[in-house]
């Protein structure tokens, strides 16, 4: 791969190492990552937000190849070269999450309607999947029903929001998790344009299903929310997204993509039972916090 990188980007590579589908490079006293694109990356979206990202010294830059393209195709695989900044590759904390990096251009969207449409499509897809592969997912049937039910409650909650606040587009990420690191956070190929509550909601949800000390996290979250500005509408959007069980749907999609064997069914049942217990316990704590802090409707998981 070294010769391809040097050819397409006219670099003289001093050091190169490979780890987890990406190459770490030192060239001309600068650090780079050459990575395969796994998610759908739209170059037009990057060009749209590039001026916004350029105002900050932490986001990585996508380097054009010698032909002026953001994406380089090698053996039918798509890659990008990222020029790194001087941030350490540490696991993100709650306070690393920003909700105020607004997109240039005074654009206004309706993310509530977009979420409703996408979530309804996701529910429809998984109901159809369960109907068509009922035998394969036999052991997971109760989990499907449980999480689909919660998903439908989340959609109903979104539909009940009648606040008139405008959805101002900000920098967010596809799926922020408690295990995500700063390299993920500042990588523009992971960035999407969405409502300001998306990242924090997905992070909270990830903590809820993975944390061994939810009480300590709730105290940290309380301090974080006090340090940020969210409207009542933002909080309702955040709460709805916390409730929507993306972690379950993501995992089933992973099963579908990797064609995991049915023999793992009982193992998966045990996993989802444990996650459901953590989720329900975490939602109880979050309900208490949100009820004390905000005047919003609360749903019991």
Residue map of PLM features:
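ATP/Mg2+ or Mg2+-diphosphate-binding catalytic cores
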Residues: 249-301
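A cross-family kinase active-site recognition segment
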Residues: 91-143
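ATP-binding glycine-rich phosphate-binding loop
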Residues: 2-29, 40, 64
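Active-site activation/catalytic loop segments of kinase-like enzymes and analogous catalytic loops
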Residues: 197-229, 242-264, 268
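An alpha-helical support segment within catalytic cores of ATP-dependent transferases
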Residues: 127-174, 282-300
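Active-site acidic catalytic loop and adjacent metal/ATP-binding pocket
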Residues: 62, 155-200
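ATP-binding pocket architecture of kinase catalytic cores
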Residues: 27-108
